[in-house]
Amino acid sequence: MARATGPEQRLLAIYTGGTIGMRSEGGVLVPGRGLAAVLRTLHMLHDEEYARAHSLPEDTLVLPPASSDQRIIYKVLECQPLFDSSDMTITEWVQIAQTIERHYTQYQGFVVIHGTDTMAFAASVLSFMLENLQKPVILTGAQVPIHELWSDGRENLLGALLMAGQYVIPEVCLFFQNQLFRGNRTTKVDARRFAAFCSPNLPPLATVGADVTINRELVRKASWKSHLVVHSNMEPDVGLLRLYPGIPASLVRTFLQPPLKGVVMETFGSGNGPTKPDLIQELRAAAERGLIIVNCTHCLQGAVTSDYAPGMAMAGAGIISGFDMTSEAALAKLSYVLGQPGLSLSDRKKLLAKDLRGEMTLPTTDDLLGDDMLGCRATWLLSMNGSQDADAMKDVLLPGLALAAAHAGDLDTLQAFVELGRDLNLKDYSGQTPLHVAARRGHASVVAMLLQKGVDVDACNEDGQSPLLLAVRGRHQSVIRLLRAAGAHLSPQELEDVGTELCRLASRADSEGLRAWWQAGADLGQPDYDGHCALQVAEAAGNADVVALLQSLEDRVSAQPQPH
């Protein structure tokens, strides 16, 4: 993430309606047109002197100088007609996304002025509609109309404009009460207070006070090699079902009927629900006929797990874990995935289990290892009979448990998985196999066992990384030798910038790192971006030991291990 540069930053503010621009008529608030005219009267949101001097159009405003060398100029585009956010549907959100697409090259960022009641839904939907964002899209609004004496609208709009104009945050965000949230992590938590929104399972991306604090490690990186893609084909036939104690199976059966194609089911605690056989049977029957069910906790914080038997039963019924997604994000994601053409049911389920736009935090291997859960879960799996329920449960849980066993170097558990007849090439949401994990951790005995079982030695995860590359980065010499002996090799993509990496290692006198790359088959004479090789860098730095090592390895190039 970087600061926006240039003397002028041009933004498009899309005014869709909402409380921020409403006026009182007959004792009730109604949508108010002409927001740009109202904003022109507010000095904190418009510098009239600058606008006159530069002959800006009536619908184009400019903020007072936020810094001595930069101005934020914004055009207000008012929707025709304005919408009450309670009436917003996918159709209106598609219109917003397409408006952003039409003006994408003209502006450095976008602010969407939206009603608060469905703003979290809108932010979630837009995050999935807008793929490969390279510019900020920030939603904001108000609890009190902007022309009222005591209104939060002025600060919210100003904050959204400043964040969109001063920082390159390539995400759909929501700005409210001095906090910038990832849009698909938000939910509305208060009907009246100005602090109306929260992000229960992810800290704010930025907090505004006397200073602006950016949580840079949380901001997603832009995909500069790809162009903006707007997904307007969203599936409208999705629903939200909240379980409650004693919910009748007949009610659930009625809800799950066609034309419904997907449902977000809010469950108790960490993903639990009633285990009554008739209810589980209705859920299983719906899943078997192709209805996709995503399990989200109705708790504000926390995530869906399978630590308890009721949660296990839900997984066994064919229900997909939503982990820590909000219901708003899960509903939007379901609509997006079901709207993608040409995908099989299995492909759609795999997409739902992946983190696509930063909407959920997937469990790490360490999470699976915590509290001795690995052994308990493996024992539970081994004790299950060969019923359809058991097979479904194993399909859900085995990938994560196999990776956890590889992480822990647990040969016994991995052998138990083999005895279950399971393929150890199975992958998690990020494309990692047990071999990736074992290679990264340096567990040579686990790597040897996996190779003996015939796993794919060159399997790549979603980042294009092979087990060999992970072993090189970890300087695990014994693992590198095992992988090379099994025929592993670094791909052209993995070797693309190897010259720069080798020069970096040489400058730091990192002999082990250089030896690892050589052991993996890399050419130590590869130049970096300016034509220097590792040996030249080591000589220039006066690293005699590194020079001697590199010369020795070059002399032994003919003896370098070759793939079989």
From Swiss-Prot:
GO process annotations (BP): asparagine metabolic process; lipid catabolic process; phospholipid metabolic process
Pfam families the UniProt entry points to: Ank_2, Asparaginase, Asparaginase_C
EC number in record: 3.1.1.5, 3.5.1.1, 3.1.1.47
ANK repeat spans: 141-170, 396-426, 430-459, 463-492, 530-559
Residue ranges occupied by any Asparaginase/glutaminase domain in the UniProt entry: 9-355
UniProt-annotated binding residues for substrate: 84-86, 116-117
GO molecular function, one term: asparaginase activity
Catalytic activity as recorded in UniProt: a 1-acyl-sn-glycero-3-phosphocholine + H2O = sn-glycerol 3-phosphocholine + a fatty acid + H(+); L-asparagine + H2O = L-aspartate + NH4(+); a 1-O-alkyl-2-acetyl-sn-glycero-3-phosphocholine + H2O = a 1-O-alkyl-sn-glycero-3-phosphocholine + acetate + H(+); 1-hexadecanoyl-sn-glycero-3-phosphocholine + H2O = sn-glycerol 3-phosphocholine + hexadecanoate + H(+)
Tissue: Expressed at high levels in liver and kidney and at a low level in stomach. Barely detectable in lung, heart, spleen and brain.
Active site: 19 (acyl-ester intermediate)
Comment on pH dependence: Optimum pH is 6.
Regulation: Inhibited by phosphatidic acid.
Cytoplasm recorded as keyword: no
PROSITE patterns in the cross-refs: ANK_REP_REGION, ANK_REPEAT, ASN_GLN_ASE_2, ASN_GLN_ASE_3
Family membership noted in the UniProt record: In the N-terminal section; belongs to the asparaginase 1 family.
NCBIfam families reported in the protein's UniProt record: asnASE_I
Subunit field text: Monomer.
Protein name according to UniProt: 60 kDa lysophospholipase
Species per Swiss-Prot/TrEMBL record: Rattus norvegicus (Rat)
Name of the gene encoding the protein in the UniProt record: Aspg
